């Protein structure tokens, strides 16, 4: 099959690799019809992680079941499914509590597993024609009948829609409240969209890319361009000097100041200053245990100079970490199905797998108009019209659940 393979920093290419196979009776093989390039893929693309050469990238995946292991009970060939980016077993101590982002089974020695991502285990990614999904009954969200026509909406359930929603959950956004969001990338836009759905009274979002700020305004946010205005001062002006009720951090360790210099603590400290006393923060931007290639000594050790004294004095609460996708994806799926949510508004490009290496270059450069890239491993027509799934031929016959 064809797949996007990581060769090294800023070097990915389409290669022919072996098809995945059923390795456990609970596995399923998914014929990937839509897969996204995620902003966090750029951490690996830029060489800021220890991703091994030869790894298939891609953790935002949607497709049709092509093959089922003998123990799979709820899925059948042809079903459209969306796969959470964090793979989980469903039966460990954390999974039983709904904390699927910290599964203790699939990545021995640490908490949390995922597809095609550094430090998250051996699973390959889904920027490919096929993907093996362990514990298929648990990990696959079966999609409604309109999935073939609305793949660009439903694929956002793999990561960024639940992650944006998670940011607002961690922050505790309630109807009528004000919320400040730092970062208008795909996750920040989904946080703004989630806040709008929840009925937030005032949504503010900080970035400096005009195309992203324009999208933020489409979901009811006041756009703050921090290359032109002091973001903290602007937030205080919009909130009668009090600060926002809630704050969301959707940037992570790659934060830059308005002059374009990488400053890892830039956003976190501004967020603390932007939220009112006794407010709360949701931090979903990726922060690394260590960042050896950073130009900042503290960041190389996974640390930052953080205004904890101000956080404490203001009595702020803070929630952090990866989203537990399965905690949200089913009811967010229903919002899409019922026409209450359309997260595909952020999609800027629909490309073939062969176009992905060039797309990575544009997306990494944050070029104007490159907001969210979706890839079609089976070609545009197969993805958009729901082409029938041919049964994959393997050396072993597997039961296909009905």
Show the residue positions of the predicted features:
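Mid-domain Rossmann-like dinucleotide-binding core that forms the NAD(H)/NADP(H) cofactor-binding site
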Residues: 80, 129, 142-229, 233, ...
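Glycine-rich cofactor phosphate-binding loops and adjacent beta1-alpha1 units
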Residues: 171-172, 198, 214, 219-315, ...
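Glycine-rich beta-strand-centered segment in the early N-terminal region that forms part
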Residues: 18-35, 46-96, 101, 123-124, ...
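Residues in the short beta-alpha loop(s) of Rossmann-like NAD(P)-binding domains
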Residues: 209, 287, 324
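Cytochrome P450 core scaffold surrounding the K-helix E-X-X-R motif
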Residues: 40-45
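Cysteine-cluster motifs in flexible loop/terminal segments that predominantly coordinate metals
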Residues: 38, 84-151
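Short, flexible surface segments
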Residues: 74-77, 175, 277
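C-terminal hydrophobic helical "lid"/dimerization subdomain
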Residues: 229, 242, 259-260, 269, ...
